[in-house]
């Protein structure tokens, strides 16, 4: 299984951080009607339960925003992906229907408020990723949005460079319909409404149901624990 390092900067500035890393062999077909119905229902429940001004006060989203501030990044300009998705749900805007793994990850982000990275393991360079802090001018091509200024953002890097931030994953390691091996980073910057184990179990159950996941491996890393 891939090794994960957490930089001293993250340990110092965001000591509550924890990441659940999942690897699995998968299939990644177009999203089924059944999964899409689950997503639409989760969106409806969220829209009926909170107002827009409450979105960034959901515990998991608030904790991610606080991490951004601790690292010197303005979360209103570079919203965590879970917050952006939650806002879209509450506004009643149509969500984008994509591939099974992408959409089931979005479903868990709607339900939990956590931002989750999902990568094609075969596109990740090397056997180790490290969570550090983005540098000024560091190149990063975000999925669907082009060049992203990741300075002061928490960023996972492989042997080549950045692959994922809570705002957007990198185009280089994105999932496609041909993805066979999956790498997930469930980024937990603080406790949410769902406990961490419940979020993890939900994610793995959806992977089995909608992505035919096999050979699932899981590991947990914490910023407040020595490696």
Q: Which residue ranges define each predicted feature?
A:
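Charge-biased, low-complexity intrinsically disordered regions
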Residues: 1-227
């Amino acid at each position: 299984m891939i090794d994960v390092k957490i930089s001293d900067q993250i340990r110092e500035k965001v000591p509550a951080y924890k990441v659940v890393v999942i690897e699995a062999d998968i299939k990644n077909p177009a999203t089924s009607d059944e999964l899409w119905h689950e997503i639409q229902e989760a969106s409806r429940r969220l829209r009926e339960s909170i107002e827009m001004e409450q979105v960034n006060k959901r515990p998991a989203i608030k904790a991610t925003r606080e991490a951004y501030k601790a690292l010197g990044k303005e979360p209103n300009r570079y919203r965590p992906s879970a917050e952006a998705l939650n806002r879209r749900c509450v506004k009643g805007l149509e969500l984008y229907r994509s591939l099974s793994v992408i959409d089931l990850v979005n479903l868990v982000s709607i339900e939990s408020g956590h931002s989750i990275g999902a990568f094609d393991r075969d596109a990740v360079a090397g056997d180790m990723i490290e969570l550090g802090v983005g540098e000024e001018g560091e190149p990063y091509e975000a999925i669907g949005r082009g060049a992203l200024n990741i300075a002061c953002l928490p960023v996972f890097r492989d042997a080549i460079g950045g692959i994922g931030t809570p705002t957007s994953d990198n185009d280089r390691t994105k999932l496609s319909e041909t993805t066979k091996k999956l790498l997930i980073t469930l980024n937990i910057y603080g406790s949410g409404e769902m406990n961490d184990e419940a979020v993890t179990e939900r994610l793995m159950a959806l992977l089995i149901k909608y992505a035919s996941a096999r050979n699932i491996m899981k590991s947990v890393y914490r910023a407040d624990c020595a490696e």
